Amino acid sequence: MTTASQPPLIMGIESSCDETGVAFVRGCELLADEVASSVDEHARFGGVVPEVASRAHLEAMTPTVRRAAERAGVRLSDVDAIAVTVGPGLAGALLVGLSAAKAYALALDKPLYGVNHLVGHVAVDQLEHGPLPKPVVALLVSGGHTSLLLVRDLATDVQLLGETVDDAAGEAYDKVARLLNLPYPGGPPIDRAARDGDGTAIHFPRGKWGDGTYDFSFSGLKTAVARWVEDAERQGRPVSVPDVAAAFQEAVADVLTRKAVDACREHGVRHLVISGGVAANSRLRALAEERCAAAGIEVRVPRPRLCTDNGAMIAALGAEVVAAGLPPSPLDMAVDTSLPVSSVLVN
């Protein structure tokens, strides 16, 4: 039970894609974070299948809640508020999480907060490094999203600076991995292969670089890699998977970090948060640290487990909106597959 001297106990539920995540948070303290992933079920299809994801969430939700509560050493009746992802994401997957959260809120008579998945990726950094400075620029890089945000206040003031106009960075990783006969999801195997490669051996294009915006494009890069591999095979030249992986990874990290640093400079921001599944990439982390150090910018990257989808990010954002005194969401709220980042809380 929460005492007057303690921050409220928040349960967070995440189900926007292929991870069922449940976590318990007090303020910036993570008590438990349990994730059930269906990635292996999607691997044979080479990508996430919405129907498979929804069924996996249905099977995993209750056991994941139980494991998280046990690990946190709390009872569900101890919870002060429940936070749940309402978007963006896959409609069926989101609906499973929202339905579960509504059921718990009604059964326990607790307030429910429907929050934004993307802003959760920023909020989770507080569980790793403490309260966020205000303002920060956030670079979110995942399989479904690549966005630059200006965050003046996590609960009330998040602005979209730019986003991908076609493929997300993580999606490009998956497609390039398939070209190189590497397993799904593509991020980790490309990162491993690139360690033995030369990132300067091949020059791949940097989409939308120097266009005066903070938008991204990775479709042209993916096509350029495909053409390079096809040309090499047609001409009988050996395809060095490590070199292709390293050069591709260099192109992605180059554009992401340059635009992120430029956004910090333009808005007078001295702190950059990088999160999302692709934030676990070693070259992206190294180049971000190098360029931010040169620009006098502090870069904050959560540990890899917190970068991927999880309940901790949703509980962390829930803790923020509760602390801000914002009213709960209505119990008749619906999922929103294209929820804009400016909508931190559904109310």
Curated annotation (Swiss-Prot):
Pfam families: TsaD. Binds 1 Fe(2+) ion per subunit. Its cofactor is Fe(2+). GO terms for biological process: tRNA threonylcarbamoyladenosine modification. GO terms for molecular function: iron ion binding; N(6)-L-threonylcarbamoyladenine synthase activity. GO terms for cellular component: cytoplasm. This is tRNA N6-adenosine threonylcarbamoyltransferase. It comes from Thermobifida fusca (strain YX). The gene is tsaD.
